[in-house]
């Protein structure tokens, strides 16, 4: 259970950008971390890695941003900036990466996230916010947007006419559908819940809908998809999903179940299929994603909440009772003394 916690941000360094937090998304990983379900949480924890705000101060060496700019910070606030991965704009794969909260920073302090009134980050990890992208419904793109955009691009599922499956229609899944449609893909939503069919097809613009427990539907769709983005963070069978793939098809996991998947090898051997994972993206690609989202009017479907509602929001998140992301209105509801 989250409760008010007082702390101070570091002084604004030469390369730092300080900003007033306006909105912060509530991500499913915040819930996992608050409950220590992944076994890596250090308390006290201040969650939040979908952070949007306005710059209040910049360090002497900051050239990309000025006071008053709208900016975002996603899942990363640090990396070594000198390894092979960082040189390749893949800071999310740096062995010395510093995540936005509950991570040890270079100075030994623990990072605190965006459920807070202000944020300070090195300019390299601050994103320019596109003018026509709403701050509130755009905030979840800093995690959900890049988490789905990056594997679609990397695995070549971003070409018009590509047949893409999206497993799960939650915070990640509904954004994956929008991203894939913007790339021109033919999108099939795969869900355990028939009740989401109308929403998937009519509201989000998916082309087809499969109920994963309906063996006839799954059988009829065998071998039809070039790739699948699996967004489900609860344990679920993956073998039926591999059956939906064409030869050389790719199943990319972006949800993070806490228990291991059951995976026989034969469904991979037959048809040379690939089971892959993907974890956010580098800063350059995240900026590209925000610009792409602004160009195609992609935002998350959000329910904006006051900060004191966050525990209730977490309880509702456990029950998947949100369409599709909570966003905290930090600026108007957090009390600062």
Curated annotation (Swiss-Prot):
Keyword Zinc appears in the UniProt entry: yes
Sorted alphabetically, which Pfam families does this protein's record hold? Answer: ADH_N, ADH_zinc_N
Annotated Zn(2+) 1 binding sites? 27, 49, 143
UniProt-listed Enzyme Commission number(s): 1.1.1.255
SMART domains reported for this sequence: PKS_ER (SM00829)
Cofactor notes: Binds 2 Zn(2+) ions per subunit.
Q: Which reaction does it catalyse?
A: D-mannitol + NAD(+) = D-mannose + NADH + H(+)
Q: Where does Zn(2+) 2 bind?
A: 80, 83, 86, 94
Name a GO molecular-function annotation.
mannitol dehydrogenase activity
PANTHER family, alphabetically?
Answer: ALDEHYDE REDUCTASE
Q: Which family does it belong to?
A: Belongs to the zinc-containing alcohol dehydrogenase family.
Name this protein carries in UniProt: Mannitol dehydrogenase
Organism expressing this protein natively:
Petroselinum crispum
């Amino acid at each position: 259970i989250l409760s008010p916690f007082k702390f101070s941000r570091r002084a604004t360094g030469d390369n730092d950008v300080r900003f007033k937090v306006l909105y912060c998304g509530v991500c499913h990983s915040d819930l996992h971390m608050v409950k220590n379900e992944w076994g890596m949480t250090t308390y006290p924890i201040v969650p939040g890695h979908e952070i949007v705000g306005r710059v209040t101060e910049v360090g002497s060496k900051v050239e990309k941003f000025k006071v008053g700019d709208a900016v975002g910070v996603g899942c990363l606030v640090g990396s070594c900036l000198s390894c092979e991965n960082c040189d390749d704009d893949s800071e999310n794969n740096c062995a010395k990466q510093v995540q936005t909260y509950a991570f040890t920073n270079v100075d030994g302090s623990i990072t605190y996230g965006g459920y807070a009134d202000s944020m300070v980050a090195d300019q390299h990890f601050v994103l320019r916010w596109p003018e026509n992208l709403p701050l509130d419904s755009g905030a979840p793109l800093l995690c959900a947007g890049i988490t789905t955009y990056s594997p679609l691009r990397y695995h070549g599922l971003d070409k018009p006419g590509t047949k893409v499956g999206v497993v799960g229609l939650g915070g990640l899944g509904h954004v994956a559908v929008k991203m894939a449609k913007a790339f021109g893909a033919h999108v099939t939503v795969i869900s355990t819940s028939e009740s989401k069919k109308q929403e998937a097809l009519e509201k989000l613009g998916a082309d087809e809908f499969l109920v994963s427990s309906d063996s006839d539907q799954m059988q009829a769709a065998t071998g039809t998809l070039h790739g699948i983005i699996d967004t489900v963070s609860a344990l679920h069978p993956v073998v039926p999903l591999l059956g939906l793939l064409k030869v050389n098809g790719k199943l990319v996991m972006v949800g993070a179940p806490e228990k291991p998947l059951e995976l026989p090898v034969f469904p991979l051997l037959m048809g040379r299929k690939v089971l892959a994972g993907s974890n956010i993206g580098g800063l350059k690609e995240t900026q590209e994603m925000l610009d792409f989202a602004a160009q195609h009017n992609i935002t998350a479907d959000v329910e904006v909440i006051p900060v004191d509602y966050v525990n209730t929001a977490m309880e509702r998140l456990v029950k998947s009772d949100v369409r599709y992301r909570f966003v905290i209105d930090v600026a108007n509801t957090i009390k600062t003394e």
